[in-house]
Amino acid sequence: MGAEPQGENSRPDRAGVLKGIQGQLADILEIDPESINEGDSFTEDLHLGSIELIELAEAIEDEFDRYTAGFRIEDEDLEDLKTVRDAVDYVVTRL
């Protein structure tokens, strides 16, 4: 479950990025993606530990690499991604 391509490698809009990240989180947490909100904190609301945060970063990289070859979340940037919104904003600005 992830961002739906809107054509051959066309980049998703903000809503598509949100949907993709919600899907990745839902897979990791085994919950309904609709229960994940943009304002949710990864640690306080979704209770992700450090291992799950790394899993999420890798899943996001895999999800969005098809739009921007070599898409990566830098280790130093990962520390600044505290909420779903932070992750969406990060991805949108780098696609």
Positions of predicted regions on the chain:
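Phosphopantetheine-dependent thiolation modules in NRPS/PKS and related acyl-activating systems
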Residues: 2-48, 52-55, 62, 66-95
